[in-house]
């Protein structure tokens, strides 16, 4: 298991945890001094009170929580958001309210999931043409909706 150092940049921060044994993502909690109200169709930057040190070759992906999306239309507009291995600042979550009613975020609310994943850098090689496939350039629903 990969170890990821974490620092509470706010003493009230809640450490992320996996809700179940095989969960892919850890729940991230809001670290707030006072509640934040998300008006319909508005965004807010929500602090977690945590900073992490990912090893080289890893990223943290921030993703919406399905229950918040289903029940309240709360999501992350840039999902999945990426935390790079060389970032050392506080992990912040951009929330958006796609719903019709205000949504209140309180300290300790689980607001997102964090999935730590490996990645590889690639070297792009410019060529004159790409190899042909049966699919070709078909995309955006070309196989049906």
UniProtKB/Swiss-Prot annotation:
The keyword Hydrolase applies. It catalyses: dUTP + H2O = dUMP + diphosphate + H(+). Its cofactor is Mg(2+). One of its GO terms (molecular function) is magnesium ion binding. GO terms for biological process: dUMP biosynthetic process; dUTP catabolic process. It comes from the Bacteria. Pathway: Pyrimidine metabolism; dUMP biosynthesis; dUMP from dCTP (dUTP route): step 2/2. The keyword Magnesium applies. Gene3D superfamilies: 2.70.40.10. It is an enzyme of class 3 (hydrolase). HAMAP family: dUTPase_bact (MF_00116). Belongs to the dUTPase family. This enzyme is involved in nucleotide metabolism: it produces dUMP, the immediate precursor of thymidine nucleotides and it decreases the intracellular concentration of dUTP so that uracil cannot be incorporated into DNA. PANTHER family: DEOXYURIDINE 5'-TRIPHOSPHATE NUCLEOTIDOHYDROLASE. This is Deoxyuridine 5'-triphosphate nucleotidohydrolase.
